Amino acid sequence: MSKLVAVALLVCALALPSAGLGGTGLANGTGVLEPGCPIDPVASDVFCPPYPIWYSLQAKQWPNTTTGLFRTRWLVPGRPGSIFRGRIKCMNVVGNAVVVGGLLTNPAILAGVPFVEYAVDNGTSGDLVSDLGLFPDGDPDLVLLPVGFPSICPAPGLAASIYGYLPLRVGSGGIFVRPPTP
């Protein structure tokens, strides 16, 4: 009987994830941001979108790499609009707040331009997401990003978004944030 218990314990131990690997961090969501002026921006040159903005975020963070995709499009009536798409290169999660950054892949004319996106998962009380922040060469707001961006993301938080936050349209979706486990 003791050999059976030992084998069972060994199988259970091997089935558990390695403590050195930790759990993956996650940020997922889709929705529509309300138009208007963002709340709590850090930068002084904030734009107030006149139209709703659709977004989609899928990001995963492992101990040694971050992957994912961000997409967004302005919902201008009667216009198809371009989808801005980028590969996620960094992710920083603190509690229910996340920031992701990377390089645009679409539209082609902006391929390689760094971007940043902030979000706060407030559960049923209403999530917040920032408008897409683009940082071409010479952009004055580049000083608000850490050295090494887009491989290293800035800190997230309600008062940390460079361009502030827009509320999600009720019933349009949401954001889910899970910090990585050590």
Region annotations inferred by a language model:
Residues 31-39:
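Short polar catalytic/cofactor-binding loops
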Residues 130-182:
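C-terminal partner/receptor-binding element of secreted or periplasmic proteins
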Residues 68-72, 125-137:
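Short polybasic amphipathic segments
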Residues 15-30:
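C-terminal region of N-terminal signal peptides and the immediate post-cleavage residues
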Residues 6-17:
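Bacterial N-terminal signal peptides
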Residues 35, 46, 88, 150-152:
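Extracellular secreted precursors and ectodomains with disulfide-bonded cysteine-rich loops/domains
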Residues 40-123:
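Predominantly extracellular/secreted and cell-surface proteins with exposed
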